């Protein structure tokens, strides 16, 4: 009876087993018909196990066995371009992959001495983020907002922008509709993103247990690349549904409910996951894979709010764990400003150190100007008599807002972003009528792409700013408009 147990009770994706005296926390348990489970809690008289397959085939009184193995998932380069479930099994109809390397889903995060400061930028291709809320490799940046405000779109655009940048991307779908997942897969295929992307899918039709382990599976796969000295990006879409799945399992196990019926350790649920994302130094990578090179794992957790309430339990928890947040505003989204980023409430705590110097220099005032514009705009609704200075501020603020707007999946490279920031600083910007700003931007960006400017100069070239200023002056004087 030490390595053998009998099913006593079956709940929804959770079973209570008598026996299994030698079972360890996190151990894989084998049931009949090759059904697998993970030890979730150890009690004096019984063991609770979460089932990873179809639990409907289990019956009371059935036997189960210890495997003396911690639950592991396959890792490796062979997974790139594939769609897998939370157990590491392929879901696409492509040929079966042979992987010899496995890794446990639960791991301890790198220690203080294993880490390095965030000092390299991770470009999203989104103008407002790369200029005002910069993200560095190894950072954890929360994306928070109500449903249908473009949270997933920001992450997909970021994945699209990593093309030819030698960054592996992992997209973890937690509790989403299958139709939404298919839509995301089709977008990634359209932009050839599956060449460097792995999709870990646990949809709404999967059990709470599978949704619960999905982000840990994704994190383990990402850590494989980080520990090889590579840069990796992981998107958790979304951790609200992950917390719901954990709450469901905990309530089935009759654990005492706390605030909003979540169990007491829901903070640790997300902190142990997100702490695994970090920039590690070359000595840590050398210990893992004999490569003297630093690696990084950048995380984009997504949290869905209700009516813009960021003070509820899960949002406040994840805000306190992460290194900053991008707040998406429903009102901005409905007024046609997309991406609907609220610059006043969004912040990047460590990304500033990783930002290119030229962008840091040019974007310093823009954030303040936009925040002041939003305040003045609200104030101007109550006052008809405005002085000329306030009117000018409102006009410039509106023009900057238009310049920061972006079409879905239309990513901007670093040179295009610098050009936009230089246009804002240029005297000619004040002369452009509001209704011509978008037209002017499209024309000058198309011109920059046409002459293939990014192939002509390096980002760290001292003359870059002068070259782009000359290009703007040439563009204006030659009336290419």
Swiss-Prot record:
One of its GO terms (cellular component) is plasma membrane. It comes from the Bacteria. The lineage of its organism: Bacteria, Pseudomonadati, Pseudomonadota, Gammaproteobacteria, Oceanospirillales. PANTHER family: ATP SYNTHASE SUBUNIT ALPHA, MITOCHONDRIAL. Transmembrane segments: none annotated. It catalyses: ATP + H2O + 4 H(+)(in) = ADP + phosphate + 5 H(+)(out). It is a peripheral membrane protein. It comes from Carsonella ruddii (strain PV). GO terms for molecular function: ADP binding; ATP binding; proton-transporting ATP synthase activity, rotational mechanism. Its main location: membrane. It is found in: Cell membrane. This is ATP synthase subunit alpha. ATP binds at residues 145-152. Keywords: ATP synthesis, ATP-binding, Cell membrane, CF(1), Hydrogen ion transport, Ion transport, Membrane, Nucleotide-binding, Translocase, Transport. It holds the Pfam family ATP-synt_ab_C. Belongs to the ATPase alpha/beta chains family. The record marks 346 as: Required for activity. Its EC number is 7.1.2.2. F-type ATPases have 2 components, CF(1) - the catalytic core - and CF(0) - the membrane proton channel. CF(1) has five subunits: alpha(3), beta(3), gamma(1), delta(1), epsilon(1). CF(0) has three main subunits: a(1), b(2) and c(9-12). The alpha and beta chains form an alternating ring which encloses part of the gamma chain. CF(1) is attached to CF(0) by a central stalk formed by the gamma and epsilon chains, while a peripheral stalk is formed by the delta and b chains.
């Amino acid at each position: 009876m030490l390595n053998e147990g009998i099913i006593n009770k079956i709940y929804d994706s959770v079973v209570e087993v008598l026996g299994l005296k030698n079972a360890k926390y996190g151990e894989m348990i084998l049931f009949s018909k090759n059904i697998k489970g993970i030890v979730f809690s150890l009690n004096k008289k019984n063991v609770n196990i979460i089932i990873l397959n179809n639990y409907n085939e289990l019956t009371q009184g059935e036997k189960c066995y210890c495997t003396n193995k911690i639950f592991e998932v396959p890792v490796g380069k062979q997974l790139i371009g594939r769609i897998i479930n939370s157990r590491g099994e392929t879901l696409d109809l492509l040929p079966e992959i042979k992987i010899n390397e496995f890794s446990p889903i639960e791991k301890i995060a790198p220690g203080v001495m294993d880490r390095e400061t965030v000092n390299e930028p991770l470009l999203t291709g989104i103008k407002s983020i790369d200029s005002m809320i910069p993200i560095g490799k190894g950072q954890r940046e929360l994306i928070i907002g109500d449903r249908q405000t473009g949270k997933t779109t920001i992450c997909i655009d970021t994945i699209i922008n990593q093309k030819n940048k030698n960054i592996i991307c992992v997209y973890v779908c937690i509790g989403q509709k299958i139709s939404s997942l298919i839509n995301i897969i089709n977008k990634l295929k359209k932009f050839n993103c599956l060449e460097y992307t792995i999709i870990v899918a646990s949809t709404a039709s999967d059990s709470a247990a599978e949704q619960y382990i999905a982000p840990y599976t994704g994190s383990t796969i990402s850590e494989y690349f980080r520990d090889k000295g590579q840069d990796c990006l992981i998107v958790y879409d979304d951790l609200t549904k992950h917390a719901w799945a954990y709450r469901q399992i905990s309530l089935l196990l009759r654990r005492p409910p706390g605030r909003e019926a979540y169990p007491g350790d829901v903070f640790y649920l997300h902190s142990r996951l997100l702490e695994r994302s970090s920039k590690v130094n070359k000595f840590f990578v050398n210990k893992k894979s004999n490569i003297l090179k630093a690696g990084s794992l950048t995380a984009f957790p997504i949290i869905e709010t209700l009516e813009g309430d960021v003070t509820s339990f899960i949002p406040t928890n994840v805000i306190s764990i992460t290194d900053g947040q991008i707040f998406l505003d429903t009102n901005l989204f409905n007024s046609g400003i997309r991406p609907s980023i609220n610059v006043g409430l969004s912040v990047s705590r460590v990304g500033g150190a990783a930002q290119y110097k030229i962008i840091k220099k040019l974007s310093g005032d823009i954030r303040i100007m936009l925040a002041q514009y939003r305040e003045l705009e609200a104030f101007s609704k109550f006052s008809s008599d405005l002085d000329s200075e306030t009117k000018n501020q409102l006009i410039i603020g509106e023009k900057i807002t238009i310049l920061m707007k972006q079409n879905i999946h239309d990513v901007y490279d670093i040179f295009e972003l610098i050009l936009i920031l230089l246009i804002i600083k240029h005297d000619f910007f004040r002369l452009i009528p509001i209704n011509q700003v978008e037209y002017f931007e499209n024309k000058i960006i198309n011109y920059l792409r046409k002459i293939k400017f990014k192939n002509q100069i390096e980002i760290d070239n001292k003359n870059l700013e002068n070259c782009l200023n000359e290009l703007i002056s040439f563009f204006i004087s030659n009336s290419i408009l």
